[in-house]
Amino acid sequence: MDKVKKSDQEWRQQLTDEQYRVTRGKGTERPFTGEYYDTKEAGVYVCVCCGEPLFTSENKYDSGCGWPSFWAPMDKEKITEEIDMSHMMVRTEILCSKCDAHLGHVFDDGPQPTGQRYCVNSASLRFHSADGDAKQEDE
């Protein structure tokens, strides 16, 4: 996979302020405020920064946490995991492997078959419905 590298200025021009804050600044949107936390349409969720397909609606579930939650990514190689020790906690941060965009965190409290909960910020995603329509947070 070829990495996408852009300058800070290029990312700022491409992304909304909220998308930049979340994906490039490792921010977190408030729960129950993101566009996709309760989306139930069939489709694919791609990285808002580089367009890499990351998650499918088939793996999405309602965890009750207020963020889009998935029990698995489309392909584990599309997600990079790093230890995050911010906010006096130890968590596992998830990033897009192609462009290093911060997506959210993964927790070991999800449903079977993986037991994992990929808790993802809506601002880091763009949704492509199965019928071909793309929905973006800044529309």
Swiss-Prot record:
Reactions listed under catalytic activity: L-methionyl-[protein] + [thioredoxin]-disulfide + H2O = L-methionyl-(R)-S-oxide-[protein] + [thioredoxin]-dithiol
Positions of disulphide bridges: none
PROSITE patterns reported in the protein's UniProt record: MSRB
Boundaries of every MsrB domain copy: 8-130
Chain sites annotated for binding Zn(2+): 47, 50, 96, 99
Pfam family, one: SelR
An example Gene Ontology molecular-function term: peptide-methionine (R)-S-oxide reductase activity
EC number: 1.8.4.12
GO biological process assignments: protein repair; response to oxidative stress
Gene3D superfamilies: Peptide methionine sulfoxide reductase (2.170.150.20)
Active site positions: 119
GO cellular component terms attached to this protein's record: cytoplasm
Keywords, in A-Z order: Metal-binding, Oxidoreductase, Zinc
Required cofactor names: Zn(2+)
InterPro entries recorded: Met_Sox_Rdtase_MsrB (IPR028427), Met_Sox_Rdtase_MsrB_dom (IPR002579), Mss4-like_sf (IPR011057)
Cofactor note: Binds 1 zinc ion per subunit. The zinc ion is important for the structural integrity of the protein.
Family membership noted in the UniProt record: Belongs to the MsrB Met sulfoxide reductase family.
The protein's name: Peptide methionine sulfoxide reductase MsrB
Lineage: Bacteria, Pseudomonadati, Pseudomonadota, Gammaproteobacteria, Oceanospirillales
Gene name, Swiss-Prot/TrEMBL: msrB
